[in-house]
């Protein structure tokens, strides 16, 4: 999934020097954060949200190393403030449960659509959502607490599998935490209590339960 990566404008304009021809006061390369982000997004761009990575340990290691670079860049930032509130759309993960549902959806005559994390920091709510267009959805409701500048604790409180004219409540199951090791206006990179990784972008819409 392509994301637009903005480069800072170069100023002043190009000027000729005696020794080196044209020169500019800004680098033709992006800054370190932009380079690391671009590399990470390129690495995951053909990985089918992580399905292909499961069968390619070398590629997984490359992606994890790129995530570690993003972790260093984001280590002093606050990633649990109001800017965390958003509908986040899955780009890539190592989480086996999510990947299993995405991969096996065809066995039930459907395909997985967007996979989302819907977070509201002020209301202390997290919904994990897997959509099955046009009418199906599986979502897990959770309560959250902000534990640190980058860590969020969560506790599942209910789950629902819903179709067009039916709904199947499921029992809640467990608790844990995740750390947002990097976040900006476009993407978020997280690592959870089990050592799984998640890369998401800000969806172009806000998901609510009224969508289904």
Swiss-Prot record:
<protein>
    <recommendedName>
        <fullName>Probable plastid-lipid-associated protein 11, chloroplastic</fullName>
    </recommendedName>
</protein>
<comment type="similarity">
    <text>Belongs to the PAP/fibrillin family.</text>
</comment>
<dbReference type="GO" id="GO:0009534">
    <property type="term" value="C:chloroplast thylakoid"/>
</dbReference>
<dbReference type="InterPro" id="IPR039633">
    <property type="entry name" value="PAP"/>
</dbReference>
<dbReference type="Pfam" id="PF04755">
    <property type="entry name" value="PAP_fibrillin"/>
</dbReference>
<feature type="transit peptide" description="Chloroplast">
    <location>
        <begin position="1"/>
        <end position="25"/>
    </location>
</feature>
<keyword id="KW-0934">Plastid</keyword>
<keyword id="KW-0809">Transit peptide</keyword>
<keyword id="KW-0150">Chloroplast</keyword>
<dbReference type="InterPro" id="IPR006843">
    <property type="entry name" value="PAP/fibrillin_dom"/>
</dbReference>
<keyword id="KW-0793">Thylakoid</keyword>
